[in-house]
Amino acid sequence: MPDSVRAETGESVAKARVHELAKELGITSKDAVAKLQELGEFVRSASSTIEAPVVKKLRDAFPDAVAAPEAAAPKAPARPAPKAPAKPAEAQASVKPVETQAPATPAAAKAAATPVAPAAPAVKEQKEGSAARPGAGGPRPGNNPFATSQGMPRAGARAEGERPAAAPASGAGRPRPGGPRPGAPRPGNNPFASSQGMPRSGGRGDGERSGGPRPAAGSGGPRPAAGSGGPRPAAGSGGPRPGAGSGASRPGGGGGNRPTPGMMPNRTERPAPAGRGAGGGAGGPGRGGGARPGGGAPAGGGFGKGGRGRGGTQGAFGKGGAGRGKQRKSKRAKRQELEQMSAPSLGGVSVPRGDGNTVVRLRRGSSITDFADKIEANPAALVTVLFHLGEMATATQSLDEETFALLGEELGYKLQVVSPEDEERELLSTFDIDFDAELEAEGDEDLQARPPVVTVMGHVDHGKTRLLDAIRNSDVVAGEHGGITQHIGAYQVNHVHEGEVRKITFIDTPGHEAFTAMRARGAKVTDIAILVVAADDGVMPQTVEALNHAQAAGVPIVVAVNKIDKEGANPEKIRGQLTEYGLVPEEYGGETMFVDVSARQNQNIDALLEAVMLTADAALDLRANPNKDARGIAIEANLDKGRGSVATVLVQSGTLAVGDTIVAGTAHGRVRAMFDDDGTAVTEAGPSRPVQVLGLSSVPRAGDTFFVTGDERTARQIAEKREAADRNAALAKRRKRISLEDFDQAVADGKVDTLNLILKGDVSGAVEALEDSLLKIDVGEGVQLRVIHRGVGAITQNDVNLATVDSAIIIGFNVKPAERVAELADREGVDMRFYSVIYAAIDDIELALKGMLKPEYEEVQLGTAEIREIFRSSKFGNIAGSIVRSGLIRRNAKARVLRAGVLIGDNLTVDSLKRVKDDATEVREGFECGIGLGSFNDLQLEDIIETFEMREKPRV
């Protein structure tokens, strides 16, 4: 219907479903959805409801389809037709209720064949009696959001007034020129019905029952029963039922309104059974009587509540209804039903299972929801399954790899957690960055020689930094606390080899056991490893670990036997020990070069550098392409008060220049300045050159890769996605795990004690190493350690506030707080500890964790006494006259009573102890005494009294 006509009739464009509009416009639902998406409207499916403005846009998009049904609408007189004469008896018969239920009579059939115009006075009487609103006899098509066609007949459909044998309708039922037609009802809401108002295949239509024509769709005449003009059988109401569309505005009515005949398919007419309503099933007893304003008759069963304009429901308990048959199940419903039947049940829920070989790939830190999306399962069901397996987690909580493996094994899936390298590759592929393809595209003409990168590795205090100091002729050790390297240093030196000045890049790694990850990173970026072994100490644990890192990285090793100037030095012993690990010296017929050096005396330093250059030239192809965007790795990073984030990076390929936009781990930014290891400003850095970079948004972690991007927006997006992935992985790693067996005990005992820490340090590598070492501390199941925040730089006010909220301890590693921050921490009672050597921090935290543990007590036997006599006292109870057989008896000690080896009384206390007549603190072996055990009086001769005390057991 055009909007102009709607405006005339006072109607508004209502909501409608997409498939209903498509049917009205004569197009397919798919075309309608596609057109709406073209118009910029988001529509999920053809059953979605769209607002009135969107309805108008769709109608305007198909003007031809709208005009066609309007052209097919019947022409009707502009004014009501004169009322046709009717017999008074027939009019009374059409409205008078019947007391008893009876089949339709021939007179009723005859009355049905007469014109329906006389029904108008009856409706008028009903309106006056029930105070119904004018026009409530039928629904207004424009306002019914559930109507199939919104009052628009299909093109070519037969109009209601043109049906054969139908008399002219009354004035109340005649349509105005271009006026609306009643819309088709929505299927009923009776949940017990098998048909739900759907038409049966080959069934009879609503308006095609035998016995004569119905009243006009818009007529206000009485509702005929069984196709007759007689009253409805067994209707409990005292008045007539309203006309045919009255049920459309209320759910729960009897038969409800009928679809417009023009919207119904042509079917073979069959006679309707007697006693059945023309528009619905048999009316149930006790139906509410009278018309309700605005919505026809009240709902069945006497409940007068109406719905929001829904169509009429079916008959009572699904009988009859609108005469529609059972709807066939859709393919989707059948598939879901089949899956539910075939899916196994675990813990009361059905979850689709794999065949044991189904591989599911998940990212680090994935949640149950991510896993559920992969296998098309309900996350809540997986939470239930996990609970029955002894693990508790929420649907959005990040899980670790072990938990996923447990869940996957139970459900028949092989879960593969994507490695960080694959995860990084997938992330960069979303930005069209493929480094592997770039390397394959490079030819030999693009590659140029580059300096070797040498990593100095070895056990703690074997002289690695002293050796590097001798090479650089600078004092590096003086800057390290405790003589232990706690940073990764990168330096570049010049060496004359065969008359040519060659550059060598050195990386100094820590030797302390806490810095395993930093040593592994050093081995990963290196070309040659120098293994430093002290001639007096020999091979130590970190020596073997460094050797394993170098061998795993596949880099050649040069052994520097240091401290040969000390007494007791035995270089030959070192060679023999390293032979066991596969490092055979050249003089023994092997391939490993051994050089005896003294870093303190600067002995054989040149020989060591010469060995490095010979190894590089003989075993390695050291070339890189300098004519491209730089890529490399962050060696270390720190937060400088004046310069901000400062990262030491090693360029591996390409050339890094000032002004380039780079991404380093979760940090990004534009390079504002670069400095070499001497502090000299440089404008660009080629392959194998270490430089300090200023301008990053945050402090990258040691070992993070960096590369140059085209613009800052891309750099920021990559950094944010990396940060989100790292955060999920950290949450999964930090997740508290508690089994069902321990859950009840944990609830009974209270929360598990947790020591919260905030770690701040001067460089990121040291903070990371400290965190890893602290998380490895295991002092029992009763105490847990949690690092709630870590960062690089001075301790700030935000750190103190966070520690206040979470009752955390702040650990400062080579950093101090500002005076104002220290005052705030003192005022809030926040404990701050400061360390410059890493193992001191580890020892203190371990002792603190042990102090948080609940004390363990052990029973210590004190002595035994045998009862010789029993003295009864009304004031003190029974007193045991005893002789001490072993040990001693002490007042207030715990006691138990044994009779012939059987425990009689336990957890007693020695309340009184007398020696002769005097009170005694303790009585030793061989002496007699009187022992009072309080209210315990079950004592006999020859009973044994054992005394003991509970002493706190020291933590190991």
From Swiss-Prot:
GTP binds at residues 458-465, 508-512, 562-565. Residues 508-511 are annotated as: G3. The keyword Protein biosynthesis applies. Coiled coil: none annotated. GO terms for molecular function: GTP binding; GTPase activity; translation initiation factor activity. Residues 325-334 have a biased composition (Basic residues). Residues 598-600 are annotated as: G5. Residues 236-257, 276-324 have a biased composition (Gly residues). SUPFAM superfamilies: Initiation factor IF2/eIF5b, domain 3 (SSF52156), P-loop containing nucleoside triphosphate hydrolases (SSF52540), Translation proteins (SSF50447). Residues 562-565 are annotated as: G4. One of its GO terms (cellular component) is cytosol. CDD domains: IF2_eIF5B, IF2_mtIF2_II, mtIF2_IVc. Residues 86-123, 141-156, 164-175, 212-235 have a biased composition (Low complexity). One of the essential components for the initiation of protein synthesis. Protects formylmethionyl-tRNA from spontaneous hydrolysis and promotes its binding to the 30S ribosomal subunits. Also involved in the hydrolysis of GTP during the formation of the 70S ribosomal complex. Belongs to the TRAFAC class translation factor GTPase superfamily. Classic translation factor GTPase family. IF-2 subfamily. This is Translation initiation factor IF-2. The gene is infB.
